Structure formats: structure tokens, C-alpha cells
């Protein structure tokens, strides 16, 4: 599993909001400049986060984006699943994927399934608040 740029940037943006307190609307341009992300690419990420209900969006003068929950309520897993679609290490264990012709005799399938569970539990066990707290101790 390789986390895409979209997933990494989405995490950075969510941390950015949380560090700012999450209350005020932050203009897209300001977020892009602060995080070193192209405004065009960030629009796509923010659209994804907004449509999924992770952030609130207000358009026009004085508008921008903000968190609509506490940082403790956003897991890294939920953000990455939204942006990546799947956190599966191999395609045959991806939810909704067509069954592999060898799935019934694949000796490695149980291992891949356990790995997927470990990855899911790991990322679901980390919140945006945890990321901020850990970075403050470095």
C-alpha cells in the first residue's frame, strides 16, 4: 500500500485546520500557501472532504473551509479511506473487488487479510489530535 499525494495532503490540511482551532473559516488560497500545495489540486481535495462531511465550506467573501468536529473525532483511517478508496495491501482483498480465480487455493490470502486488518486498526486508532500531539513532542 502506497498512500497517494492526495491522501498525504488531505491529512496535512486536516491537521492545519485543527492547529488553527477549527473554528474559523480559512480561505483556500491561505491553506494552499501555508501547506505548499497548488490551489487547483487543493480544490479537488477540499471538494472531496466537503462532500463527505469532513469539513464545512462557505463560498464567497469571508468564506473558506473549517472542521465541523473536534480533531479527536477524525481518524487517519477515515481520511485515508476517503481519499485512497482502500487501504488494502493487495487488490484481491479490496472490498468490492472481483474474486481472484485462485482465492480458494491461495495460501497467502489469510496473511493478506490479516495485514489489511492490522493496517485498518492502526490507522483507525490514530486521530488528527494524536498527530498534533505527537509532532509537539518531537
Predicted regions, residues:
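A short alpha-helical element within helix-turn-helix/winged-helix DNA-binding domains
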Residues: 26-36
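Short, hydrophobic-biased segments on the C-terminal half of alpha helices
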Residues: 46-47
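Alpha-helical residues within the helix-turn-helix
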Residues: 33, 50-51
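Beta-hairpin "wing" of winged helix-turn-helix
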Residues: 54-62, 66-67
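Short amphipathic alpha-helical interface segments
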Residues: 8-22
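Non-DNA-binding regulatory cores of transcription-related proteins
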Residues: 68-138
Amino acid at each position: 500500500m502506497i498512500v497517494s499525494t492526495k491522501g498525504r495532503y488531505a491529512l496535512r490540511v486536516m491537521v492545519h485546520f485543527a492547529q488553527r482551532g477549527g473554528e474559523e473559516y480559512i480561505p483556500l488560497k491561505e491553506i494552499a500557501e501555508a501547506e505548499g500545495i497548488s490551489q487547483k489540486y487543493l480544490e479537488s481535495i477540499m471538494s472531496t472532504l466537503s462532500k463527505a462531511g469532513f469539513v464545512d465550506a462557505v463560498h464567497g467573501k469571508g468564506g473558506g473551509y473549517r472542521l465541523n468536529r473536534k480533531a479527536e473525532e477524525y481518524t487517519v483511517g477515515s481520511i485515508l479511506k476517503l481519499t485512497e478508496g482502500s487501504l488494502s495491501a493487495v487488490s484481491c482483498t479490496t472490498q468490492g473487488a472481483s474474486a481472484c480465480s485462485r482465492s480458494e487455493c491461495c495460501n497467502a490470502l489469510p496473511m493478506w487479510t490479516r495485514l489489511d486488518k492490522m493496517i485498518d486498526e492502526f490507522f483507525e486508532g490514530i486521530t488528527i489530535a494524536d498527530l498534533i500531539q505527537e509532532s509537539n513532542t518531537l
